[in-house]
């Protein structure tokens, strides 16, 4: 079997970017990956076999280990393709976006982008728009720099394969969402404002209107959080659950590309949407 064809069949370039970023920084890990690739090739090209015994052994890898030039040459074409894709500049940012609480430049930016992109998709499908977006601070894995932002940086920010979903919540469930935000001293939020007092959410406004517990609200989030991740149990048993068939990371990339084509740049900022006393 042709080795290059085998690698093409086995590797999804985009899905493995985050691992590749680690690989670039870790010489020992690079050696281990080389060993695993060789094992994969021999396994794929061989007839069916059964394991009859296992004999463990130690393979010492450190920064004095020589690179395997054959494996390096095999990987190089795919590394080049990956580098070209990840180095694409998506947009310029007028300021650094960083995490923080109760609100932050990064949390506000990503929540706003996610709500905007989600409503674009819903509008094209003639579906009701979402009212708010709520994400989690733990899902934002790095800051975004001032200046050029490339695809690779968004993969660092969002290395997960989380999908964007829209949940329709009862007023009671939505109240639980805001209570969670208050107890957490803030989460990435868009479309709503509130004040945190003694770990309670007060003066809640959604779309400029006072929160009404008798109404239902449509919330954009990730499938991970919608499934109860980070103990967000208020998302359990929603009135409705819609999958938008777009990854959270891709929604961010799509927005940045589109805004850049319009000649726009990012302006990360805080605006008082979550106040803590």
Regions found by a protein language model. Give the residues of each.
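Sec-dependent signal peptide recognition
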Residues: 30-35
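Feature captures C-terminal
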Residues: 48-60, 115-117, 123-277
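C-terminal motif of bacterial Sec signal peptides marking the signal peptidase cleavage site
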Residues: 41-44
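Helix N-terminus capping/helix-initiation residues
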Residues: 29, 67-68, 150, 247
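Generic hydrophobic, helix-prone segments enriched in Leu/Val/Ile
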Residues: 15, 72-79, 192, 201, ...
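Hard-cation-handling environments
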Residues: 54-143
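N-terminal secretory signal peptides that target proteins for export/translocation
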Residues: 1-29
